[in-house]
Amino acid sequence: LGAFAQEQKGVSEVERNYQAGTSPLTTTPMVQSTNPKAPPMSLVEFEAARKIYFERCAGCHGVLRKGATGKPLTPDLTVAKGTDYLKVFIAYGSPAGMPNWQTSGEMDEATVDLMARYIQHDAPTPPEWSLDDTKKTWKVTVAPKDRPTKKMNNFNIENIFSTTLRDTGEIALIDGDTKEIISIIKTGYAVHISRMSASGRYLFVIGRDAKINMIDLWMAKPDSVAEVRIGLEARSVETSKAKGYKDKLVIAGAYWPPQFTIMDGDTLEPKKIVSTRGMVVGTQEYHPEPRVASILGSHYKPEFIVNVKETGKTLMVDYSNLDALKITEIGSAPFLHDGGLDASKRYFMVAANNSNKIAAIDTKDGKLAGLTDVGKIPHPGRGANFTHPQFGPVWSTGHLGDDTISLIGTDPKKFKQYAFKEVAKLKGPGGGALFVKSHPKSKNLWSDAPLNPDPKISQAIVVYDINNLDKGYKTLPIAEWADLKDDGAKRVVQPEYNKAGDEVWFSVWSAKNKESAIVVVDDKTLKLKKVIKDPRLITPTGHFNVYNTQHDVY
């Protein structure tokens, strides 16, 4: 059995790094249950194992251990296997995809024994999160009546960048014109995304701990004016964009509990909570914890487009009457994650990452327009739109699990034969890509690979000429240009254009105790334009240009 397990090649280092991110549930108090059939564990051991589980395992096996992208690990399955059997598979992994935790050096023998016993006990359940719980966290620090009635600063708001400072629980607002930091704002832990109000005045950020901050960019020094926590773990926030509803509502989706919350657009006062627990598309099996992934505000209707990860459903949530909420359910494929609009802003292209598919949601007609196979574990961010010389308008995504970029046709009128199909693959340097990006005024397509284990790949960026894709990519040594003097990881992450579309910004991301930077490149010449260094730029990761985020330009 051990020899067989050692042959496993199911999980790459890239995939393990992506799936095994620390969960905020690590520090959430939970009760140890007793299972008389399970091997004994002290309370201290149980707490240690629970912490490791939420740091390393919950991303694949689920909060309740009932399975997500990985297999279920519930006592009805694990007790019968026995401790010795489980230790082998934790230590050596399996061809089906279990990482080899001990032989990779991630766990020692004692930790493997601890985890083998832990998964034979009943899974501790984190608490639910009600409207009352949400209201207890809701704070309005500057009431709407006390906010400016006009812009009180000289910043070019449309060219401000919101940059996540991942490990400090902050964002940096950076002036895209001067390249100077405007302010550092305290937020939730590890801000996942920044999103704009339809008017462009308010910036909304959400941490992995489900805390939302509402930031007023009209203030003399932009700062948070309201905050709320919508659960225990989350990834997504969005605002209403439809005519007559601009700036009226905000929505956020939680990983735990599996639900979304609709709030007032001026104050973040919670108004409505909707659970996403339900049946998986295709198998029609009940799933107890389907996480809310990406959310988009429709430009066509008063609807939020909510992607539910494990069930593979896209929910078209009509917010015109919260007291009589209407939801249209569109099934595509399990493990829906991130995505963005095509160039026409009609079709929401969303990755079903562990299904290796891209779904195209027609936001105007409210239906599934297409579902196409792509590479291994697509991760587009919001993707990248450009016009291909042969296939017309395409939307593109990179992949975590292979070295390709998939191009998908998005014009069913003029290029019907290519619509919502993978029309081409570009070869990249290696897996581990998180974001691709282009711009309507650019001839370039950019891709990162920060999770690639090879520093030569993770510390660089690749760029393609969209008019000469057959020539392959050029590699730019972004981390080298940053000229950081220590031995940090220097992972280059998330290309982001300025408003004009003539600069591309990159984070050079190292650990909290190492130096990081932001590198700005001239999009036309591909030459270094500016390196932004500041002691306050600690673990910069994602960044979002106000105008491009507000208008879905990517």
Regions found by a protein language model. Name each.
Residues 392-397, 403-405, 430-516:
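Loop/turn-rich, solvent-exposed surfaces of beta-rich toroidal or solenoidal domains
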Residues 42-63, 85-92:
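Sequence/structural segment immediately N-terminal to covalent heme-attachment motifs in c-type
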Residues 138-155, 195-198, 237-246, 285-300, ...:
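Structural signature of eukaryotic scaffold interfaces centered on beta-propeller domains
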Residues 10-52, 149:
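Electrostatic cytochrome c docking/interface patches
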Residues 215-220, 263-271, 318-322, 362-367, ...:
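Short loop/turn segments immediately following beta-strands, especially the blade-tip
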Residues 180-185, 221-229, 269-274, 278-285, ...:
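A short beta-strand motif characteristic of beta-propeller blades
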Residues 7-20, 64, 68, 74-126:
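Extracytoplasmic electron-transfer domains, predominantly the class I c-type cytochrome c fold
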Residues 224-312, 323-331, 336:
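Asp-box/WD-like beta-propeller blade repeats and closely related beta-sheet repeat scaffolds
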